[in-house]
Swiss-Prot record:
Domain of life, per lineage: Bacteria
Organism: Aliivibrio fischeri (strain ATCC 700601 / ES114) (Vibrio fischeri)
Primary subcellular site in the record, as a coarse category: cytoplasm
Domain annotation Rhodanese: ranges: 19-107
EC assignment: 2.8.1.1
Active site per the UniProt annotation: 67
Cited function: Transferase that catalyzes the transfer of sulfur from thiosulfate to thiophilic acceptors such as cyanide or dithiols. May function in a CysM-independent thiosulfate assimilation pathway by catalyzing the conversion of thiosulfate to sulfite, which can then be used for L-cysteine biosynthesis.
InterPro entries: GlpE_sulfurtransferase (IPR050229), Rhodanese-like_dom (IPR001763), Rhodanese-like_dom_sf (IPR036873), Thiosulf_sulfurTrfase (IPR023695)
GO biological process: glycerol metabolic process
Subcellular location: Cytoplasm
Molecular-function annotations in GO: thiosulfate-cyanide sulfurtransferase activity
Designated name of the protein: Thiosulfate sulfurtransferase GlpE
Annotated catalysed reactions: thiosulfate + hydrogen cyanide = thiocyanate + sulfite + 2 H(+); thiosulfate + [thioredoxin]-dithiol = [thioredoxin]-disulfide + hydrogen sulfide + sulfite + 2 H(+)
């Protein structure tokens, strides 16, 4: 895949729940927002944690990127594609869309 794909919050949740896919959600919001609430098991991706992500997540695993509203995640998703990740999605609507859809959040 040379490009990331877009995914809705509902489809993102479904993909994360499929155990056989071993999908990973990365949240690129600021630390304070992440602490206030995030998707369960989300990886907080920052400039300081990118190496950790690349060491822990195989390039074949689906990676879903979430930001506030679904805009900044597109740049981060393309960056991950450029690093070699094969199946990368930008979550349309971001955390706001996830929260408005009533999907589960942990604090």
């Amino acid at each position: 895949m040379d490009q990331f794909q877009h995914i809705s919050v509902v489809d993102a949740q479904e993909k994360l729940q499929q155990q056989d896919l071993n999908a990973v959600l990365v949240d690129i919001r600021d630390p304070q927002s992440f602490i206030r609430g995030h998707v369960e098991n989300a990886f907080h991706l920052t400039n300081d944690t990118i190496v950790e992500l690349m060491n822990e997540v195989d390039f074949e695993q689906p990676v879903l990127v979430m930001c506030y509203h679904g805009h900044s995640s597109q740049g981060a998703a393309q960056y991950l594609v450029n690093q070699g990740y094969e199946e990368v999605y930008s979550v349309d609507g971001g955390f706001e869309g996830w929260h408005k859809a009533g999907l589960p959040v942990e604090k």
